[in-house]
Amino acid sequence: MMDLDKIIASLRDGKHIPEETVFRLCLNSQELLMNEGNVTQVDTPVTICGDIHGQLHDLLTLFEKSGGVEKTRYIFLGDFVDRGFYSLESFLLLLCYKLRYPDRITLIRGNHETRQITKVYGFYDEVVRKYGNSNVWRYCCEVFDYLSLGAIINNSIFCVHGGLSPDMTTVDEIRTIDRKQEVPHEGAMCDLLWSDPEDVDTWSLSPRGAGFLFGKREVDQFLEKNNVELIARAHQLVMEGYKEMFDGGLVTVWSAPNYCYRCGNVAAVLKIDDDLNREYTIFEAVQAQNEVGNAIIPTKKSQMDYFL
């Protein structure tokens, strides 16, 4: 039996976790996540969090600002890993909290929770640097395949990492996807993780090379068809931490302050109360990113500028 509280304390301090412990954490997480649907039902009150991207110290600040997991319900909208230097610790910490408080944490898959993307944007290299092999990366990727694709809060707010898909316009259709796989390069599962809202008249190809751009018309149709009042998503850097669009029918939440340790943005989380009122909490980056755990060592592989 694993001592989750002890592992959580070690992860919060940035300490090394033995490979065997990571294997057991990931295996137990798969067993828990496989019993959740593609779209998880979540009650209020709940706090919605956007991209984390391996910024462990800022994730700890998020919990300080919004409340401990033992007393606060959270939805994380994906992109736990890549770009930041503590992707592994950030993801494992969230898995530990999920195992310790399964009804308090909902984890949604982002476009970075894939084998292909993590090989390019830092997570793979981080694991090899810390363990000398890629086993832990492989264990985590197997967990990625079991993460939910979305969540519904009180049957009124649809949460997703990226956005909408022209191939599936109802939540019930999304529930039918076979999610336990690497994210395809096209199709509804891909679109949910890759698409972006934009001031466009109709579905348009995304410059990202995956997913679509969608506008107010598509959002209004989705809200009406599914009898929900808000789409909450992440996936795009927002300098102010959050951005509402389309008469408040969609919001982007971004939770990685000073993204990539250089963008200068603030971060936000969105609390939804029992009456579905919205309350945004803004927070700034931790100044000394190497105060906890080992000093930061950048990955050797050059990383493309922000576009994923």
Swiss-Prot record:
One Pfam family of this chain: Metallophos
A GO molecular-function annotation: protein serine/threonine phosphatase activity
Catalysed conversion reaction: O-phospho-L-seryl-[protein] + H2O = L-seryl-[protein] + phosphate; O-phospho-L-threonyl-[protein] + H2O = L-threonyl-[protein] + phosphate
One GO term of the biological process aspect: negative regulation of DNA damage checkpoint
Predominant localisation class: cytoplasm
Known partners and oligomeric status: Catalytic subunit of the histone H2A phosphatase complex (HTP-C) containing PPH3, PSY2 and PSY4. Inactivated in a complex with phosphatase methylesterase PPE1 (PP2Ai). Interacts with phosphatase 2A activator RRD1, which can reactivate PP2Ai by dissociating the catalytic subunit from the complex. Interacts with SPT5 and TAP42.
Family that this chain belongs to: Belongs to the PPP phosphatase family. PP-4 (PP-X) subfamily.
Note: Present with 2840 molecules/cell in log phase SD medium.
Protein name: Serine/threonine-protein phosphatase 4 catalytic subunit
Source organism (scientific name): Saccharomyces cerevisiae (strain ATCC 204508 / S288c) (Baker's yeast)
